[in-house]
Amino acid sequence: MNILPNPRRQPWAPNARGIDTLATDARGSMARGSMARNLAIWASTFLVIALLSLPAMAQNHLLIETESFEDKGGWVIDQQSFVVMNSSYIMAHGMGRPVKDAVTTVKFPKTGKYHLWVRTKDWAPFPKGPGKFQVILDGKSTGQTFGESGSDAWKWYDGGVIDIKNATTKLALKDLTGFNGRCDALLFTDDLKFTPPNELEALTAFRRKLLNLTDKPQDAGRYDLVVVGGGIAGTCAAISAARMGLTVALIQDRPVLGGNNSSEVRVHLMGDVDKNHYPKLGRIVREMDNGDPGNGNPDAKEYGDARKISIVKAEKNISLFLNTHVFKVEKENDIITAVVGRDIATNQERRFSGSFFSDCTGDGTVGFLAGADFRMGRESKAETGESLAADKSDDFTLGTSNLWASVDRDTVSSFPETPWAMQFSDEYHIDEPKSDWQWETGFGNFNTITQAEQIRDHNLRAIYGNWSYLKKNKAAKYGKKELAWVAYIGGKRESRRIIGDYVLNQMDIQEGKFYPDGSVTATWTIDLHFPDAKNSKYFEGQEFFAGTKHIKVAPYTIPYRCLYSKNIQNLFMAGRNIRTTHGAFGSTRVMRTCGMMGEVVGFASYIANKYKTSPRGVYKDHLPELTGILKGETLAPQP
């Protein structure tokens, strides 16, 4: 396989000693200089003062994106809020233990006075949160503590005027608590009166200018199929298409594959692959399967990250792009021509063009950006005729989990007080040493896409608050237990469902209807989550613990027509963002089932490429050939 790295170099990017900068003097002439390391982008703009013959005054802005620090120490990159921030950030995720400093080197063009601005937030202002950190320059604190302002809005905080004595300076972020302090960027400016913008549109333009991000990203190539989303569905789609001889780009916004089944989220695979109407479907899912380590296993290796990547690496037709968030779609009329992604660490942008695209993001990101019709939330009974539908349509969705686990130690340990977290009591607390699927937030009171950060933070407040209570009040049981792992990447269940040519519903599932284009065989119960009644009693409107009622079903097939967009002509879907009703979604959403959807998409994309037709054209004109592949009657071409 051709793994394409995400290099730090760009045409405009720095070499090991500095970066090319562009300055315009008062006469409009251009001068280039080499003035900083690869983590700081200088934008030098000269303001022409039209007062008599006064000379031009120079302003130098040094923007440092924290996700690009050379050594992130114990801080982690979080891209989950890219859709509302247009940026990633780093976070001190230490589970109550301060993490190692994040460190980088900055090269200033001159010594002297600079105004420091720090973009951060107080993530748990109840009344003040625990995410405190300091900015360190050459081993000395700048004198302020950030992350405890009492405001949960992302904005620039005034760090005061700093006297830079060394042109080459070591910059560090020092975590003070281990409780998820976070920082998006730092700005040094020699215009001591300048205030950076906070409004998103202006901030995005400001950021793009200083990072020299143009409208011409690096060309990442053209592919037969571009798969966006490297969860189980997307990875299986990429492998399936590659084994049919197609060139494939697989784009994933995290450093690992597997999505909810990766070590970052740790949800086990569910759904059967051995009850298939087409028994040979599911072979790739079996390759990816790591058995059943359960949910939230403290041993990361149990989720097989390395094996998943090694399987993809073995496919010479796949070009893998990790750490790449797709944020833009290019199209002509109703046909996607390319997607653009940004590296979540280096901010390098790449353009991926292709004949066909598969949205395996879970959130339906590609479809949404392309203008595909979609649905989010519950339909009404009047709309669907389903007994499980809501009386009135609403925004209710299944929630997001941040799983956690503790381990036994030889000695007693303590845990900090957490006045900013959810508060528990003898009357109500959750007496367990690790989580399972029930730890879940987002039942319509949070938007699972635009409020992903708030959902995760709400889950963290529940986890840390409950653990603090257990350590203090049940010492006999929990005294020697220690938090070993808490997920900072949310395991999302439901968001957008892209509308296809068919909408699978509750009756299709319970009546076992079989359609001519039935493809994936699904077996999971109709499993719709709702807030646990006792949790609602004590945390009404702030629930973080779920209940469910499993409705058993016989094996049924999902029509191929659910796996492509109704109004975007070259867009496939696989995973939880296919078009079903909310009720049917309760059964189709589990990962082995989603992986088989990916396999079908890979086969269908082969036929679409072969005949230069659309995903719909595969259904209308070539369904027997697709069925033959599903049955194993049609051999894959030799790559």
Model features per residue range: what roles?
Residues M1-N38:
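N-terminal secretory signal peptides that target proteins for export/translocation
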Residues W42-S53:
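Bacterial N-terminal signal peptides
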Residues L54-A58:
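Sec/Tat signal peptide C-region and signal peptidase I cleavage site
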Residues Q59-Q218:
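Extracytoplasmic
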Residues N212-D215, D219, N260, N323, ...:
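Flavin (FAD/FMN)-binding glycine-rich loop and adjacent Rossmann-like elements that form
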Residues D219-G231:
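Beta1/beta-strand and adjacent pyrophosphate-binding region of the FAD-binding site
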Residues G234:
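N-terminal Rossmann-fold NAD(P) dinucleotide-binding loop
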Residues L246-T247, Q252-E332, R375, L398-A405:
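Conserved N-terminal/central alpha/beta ligand/cofactor-binding core
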